[in-house]
C-alpha cells in the first residue's frame, strides 16, 4: 500500500510539473521553431559571443556565417559595464559596489519589423581592501555570471518569438 501511494505521489508531481511547462534550469525549448540564425556581434571572439553561441547550440539552432535575408538574424551590440559605489568604510574607502552590465540586441525576422531589446543586470559586490586580488577575481566572476545570464535571456527571447 505504501509503495502504491508513493508511486502515485511521484506520478502526480511529475504530471503537475510537465503540465505547467516546467523545464530544468539551462534547458532551452525552441518554441519559435528556429532552425538556424545569423549571429552578428562587434567582437566575434569575445566572451559574450561565445556564451551566445553556446546557448544557441543548447537550443539546437545552427549558426550561419553569412547573412541570409530569408533567415532570422540576431544582432548583438556592444557590452556596457558600470561600477557604482554603494557604501563606504569609516576611512572613506569604498566598501560595497553595484556592478552593472548591459547589452542591446536586435532580432530581425524575414518580412517583419526588427525587434530591439536591452538587457540590464545589476549585482552588489563587497570590496575587501585587505584581499585586493581575491576581490578583483570575485568581481571578474560576477561579471562572467552576468554575461552568461544575459546570453541565456537573449536566447530565451529568441526562442519564444511568434513565428
Enumerate the language-model features and the residues they cover.
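Surface-exposed short loop/turn segments
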Residues: 75-118, 124-140
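C-terminal/domain-edge helix-coil "capping" segments
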Residues: 133-163
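N-terminal segment of the mature soluble domain
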Residues: 33-80
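Bacterial signal peptide processing site
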Residues: 21-23
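Sec/Tat-exported extracytoplasmic proteins
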Residues: 56, 60, 107-111, 129, ...
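C-terminal motif of bacterial Sec signal peptides marking the signal peptidase cleavage site
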Residues: 17-19
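Bacterial N-terminal signal peptides that target proteins for export
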Residues: 1-9
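Short, low-complexity, disordered segments immediately C-terminal to signal peptides
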Residues: 27-32
Amino acid at each position: 500500500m505504501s509503495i502504491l501511494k508513493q508511486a502515485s505521489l511521484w506520478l502526480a508531481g511529475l504530471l503537475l510539473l510537465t503540465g505547467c511547462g516546467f523545464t530544468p534550469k539551462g534547458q532551452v525549448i525552441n518554441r519559435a521553431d528556429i532552425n538556424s540564425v545569423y549571429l552578428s556581434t562587434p567582437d566575434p571572439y569575445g566572451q559574450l559571443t561565445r556564451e551566445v553561441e553556446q546557448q544557441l547550440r543548447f537550443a539546437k539552432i545552427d549558426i550561419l556565417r553569412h547573412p541570409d535575408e530569408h533567415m532570422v538574424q540576431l544582432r548583438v551590440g556592444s557590452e556596457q559595464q558600470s561600477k557604482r559605489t554603494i557604501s563606504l568604510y569609516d576611512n572613506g574607502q569604498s566598501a560595497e559596489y553595484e556592478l552593472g552590465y548591459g547589452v542591446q540586441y536586435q532580432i530581425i525576422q524575414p518580412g517583419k519589423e526588427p525587434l530591439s531589446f536591452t538587457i540590464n543586470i545589476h549585482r552588489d559586490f563587497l570590496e575587501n581592501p585587505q584581499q585586493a586580488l581575491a576581490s578583483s577575481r570575485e568581481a571578474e566572476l560576477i561579471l562572467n555570471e552576468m554575461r552568461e545570464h544575459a546570453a541565456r535571456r537573449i536566447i530565451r527571447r529568441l526562442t519564444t518569438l511568434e513565428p
